[in-house]
């Protein structure tokens, strides 16, 4: 019941909050202008931008340049961090390959961590590099999505200014909400301090070092921005990051808020005036929510069912291996599904200890990479499936392939197919390399089916810009650092470039009349068709390897 109430409440909050996002996205005046405008203008002066409207090509160039600059600075700081200030625990520099992986990971909103949070970075890099990139990577995804929506919906005839979009989103959305969430987490016991690690003497007389630091400030944007990188190695399974059931709900709600709101925002932009949400967006929301609930049901059923091998020995009950008692199997499964559906990557339990079908659920969500997804890019990926579904359905019934009065032609379909294929190609090719390259497979700590699942999960998490992992994998090696870094880089930027090309191409040949021979996108049967094509296309792509991994493991447990 608590899960049903929580999900219902989050849908309602996201619907209401999308109205505020609508004013932020379209640069409309609001009551908060007096608070934020001066700070925004100061940021624009520092950046040196004149807020001129950009073409799609210029917008992409500035997006890539901005991200490239941040990536270089991050890499340099990580390889010299031990010689900088705010390092009371005397943490060492990262190796070249690990710094490469870490910089790309946080730059692309993945937050895949091949280092221990306690010892891998200093307080300085944790706050200036990691926390800063959590804001900018999230805002970058939002900015390119809003640019795409402005053109697709025809609400404006401009794509916007990249720096204006990113600054407004950080100042008016991320910063206020992060401050509020940080305060709420501190009331639940999450630390926020610059003191060095605590050194205590245990009851047995041994010395123990307890790691803590400025955790609350990172924890808020970590979930709000669908980032996922933990201050501590145990991530949100540790009491300092996630002390109790209330902090658990706060963190889950933070992950869901903005991606859900983006879908409703799309609906408001389609309705032109923003006071209501267009039926097309509601159909998309219901379709994604249906897949979300289906995967959640599978995961919870599998975790509550427990391990059949133990059941045969007379040990009945839920699968509690790798889980925190304060959360139990139910809330652990919910957190797992949310963090992979919304591509956050934080964990409140160890995914490597999930049952075979319990691990299948989050893996499938990342393979789909379309069920709500991360900030902005999740909606962009969904629209690719919408265009693909429309094109196939239209040809099947002899109607004109058209979306929002814009004909879908051969040029757009080439880009759409490329976006669709990049994701599985990166996952499958690099997974195969992990078994072929000498030394790479030595990182696999489990034999047979589960070992394949470990590799597939790691590569899928990198390709989906998620960041969670089956942490039994020994991933801090040259192969895993470089390979996952390349995957994260390609899977982030190539689709974004192609998606903006698709939207610009559609708009340039926009038709201003409604053709009666087109598929209705605001009817329930379109939502059903979308679900069928998502499952069918992804199933044909990934079923063979899933049979070698979690499904094969499930069939062997008796």
Curated annotation (Swiss-Prot):
Alphabetic keyword roster: Cell membrane, Ion transport, Membrane, Potassium, Potassium transport, Transmembrane, Transmembrane helix, Transport
Location within or outside the cell: Cell membrane
Domain of life: Bacteria
Annotated transmembrane regions: 1-21, 66-86, 127-147, 166-186, 245-265, 281-301, 327-347, 354-374, 377-397, 416-436, 482-502, 531-551
Primary location class: membrane
S-S bridge residues: none
Topology in membrane: Multi-pass membrane protein
GO function terms (MF aspect): P-type potassium transmembrane transporter activity; potassium ion binding
UniProt function note: Part of the high-affinity ATP-driven potassium transport (or Kdp) system, which catalyzes the hydrolysis of ATP coupled with the electrogenic transport of potassium into the cytoplasm. This subunit binds the extracellular potassium ions and delivers the ions to the membrane domain of KdpB through an intramembrane tunnel.
NCBIfam families in UniProt: kdpA
Subunit field text: The system is composed of three essential subunits: KdpA, KdpB and KdpC.
Protein family per UniProt: Belongs to the KdpA family.
UniProt protein name: Potassium-transporting ATPase potassium-binding subunit 1
Gene it is expressed from: kdpA1
């Amino acid at each position: 019941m608590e899960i049903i109430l929580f999900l219902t409440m989050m849908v309602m909050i996201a619907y209401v909050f999308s109205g505020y996002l609508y004013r932020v996205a379209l640069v409309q005046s609001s009551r908060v202008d007096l608070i934020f405008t001066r700070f925004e203008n100061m940021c624009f002066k520092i950046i040196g931008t004149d807020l001129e409207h950009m073409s799609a090509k210029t917008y992409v160039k500035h997006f890539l340049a901005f991200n490239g600059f941040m990536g270089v600075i991050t890499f340099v700081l990580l390889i010299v961090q031990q010689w900088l200030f705010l390092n009371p625990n005397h943490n060492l520099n990262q190796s070249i390959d690990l710094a490469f992986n870490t910089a790309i990971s946080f730059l692309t909103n993945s937050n895949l961590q091949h280092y221990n949070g306690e010892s891998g970075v200093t307080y300085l890099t944790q706050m200036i590099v990691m926390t800063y990139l959590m804001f900018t990577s999230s805002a970058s995804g939002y900015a390119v999505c809003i640019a795409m929506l402005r053109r697709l919906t025809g609400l404006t005839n401009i794509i916007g200014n990249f720096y204006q979009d990113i600054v407004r989103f950080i100042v008016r959305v991320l910063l206020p909400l992060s401050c509020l969430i940080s305060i709420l987490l501190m009331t639940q016991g999450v630390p926020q301090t610059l003191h060095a690690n605590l050194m205590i003497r245990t009851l047995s007389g041994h010395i123990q070092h307890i790691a803590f630091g400025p955790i609350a400030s990172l924890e808020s944007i970590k979930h709000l921005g669908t980032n996922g990188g933990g201050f501590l190695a145990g991530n949100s399974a540790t009491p300092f990051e996630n002390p109790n059931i209330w902090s658990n709900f706060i963190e889950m709600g933070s992950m869901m808020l903005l991606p859900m709101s983006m879908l409703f925002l799309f609906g408001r932009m389609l309705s032109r005036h923003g006071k209501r949400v267009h039926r097309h967006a509601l159909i998309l929301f219901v379709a994604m929510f249906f897949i979300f609930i289906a995967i959640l049901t599978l995961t919870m059923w599998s975790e509550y069912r427990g391990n059949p091998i133990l059941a045969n020995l007379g040990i009945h009950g839920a699968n509690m291996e790798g889980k925190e008692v304060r959360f139990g199997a139910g809330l652990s499964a919910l957190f797992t599904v949310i963090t992979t559906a919304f591509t956050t990557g934080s964990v409140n339990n160890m995914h490597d200890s999930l049952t075979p079908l319990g691990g299948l659920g989050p893996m499938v969500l990342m393979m789909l990479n379309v069920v709500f997804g991360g900030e902005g890019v999740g909606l962009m990926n969904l629209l690719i499936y919408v265009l693909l579904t429309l094109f196939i359905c239209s040809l099947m019934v002899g109607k004109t392939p058209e979306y929002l009065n814009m004909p879908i032609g051969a040029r757009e379909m080439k880009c759409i197919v490329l976006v669709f294929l990049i994701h599985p190609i990166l996952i499958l090719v690099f997974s195969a390399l992990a078994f072929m390259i000498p030394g790479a497979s030595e990182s696999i700590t489990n034999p047979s089916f589960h070992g394949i699942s470990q590799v597939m999960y790691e590569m899928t998490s990198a390709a989906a810009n998620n960041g969670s992992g089956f942490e039994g994998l020994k991933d801090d090696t040259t192969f895993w650092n470089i390979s996952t870094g390349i995957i994260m880089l390609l899977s982030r930027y190539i689709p974004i470039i192609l998606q903006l090309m698709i939207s610009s191409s559609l708009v340039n040949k926009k038709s201003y009349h409604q053709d009666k021979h087109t598929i209705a996108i605001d009817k329930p049967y379109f939502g059903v068709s979308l679900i069928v094509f998502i499952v069918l296309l992804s199933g044909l792509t990934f079923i063979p390897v899933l049979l070698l991994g979690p499904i094969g493991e499930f069939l062997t447990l008796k």
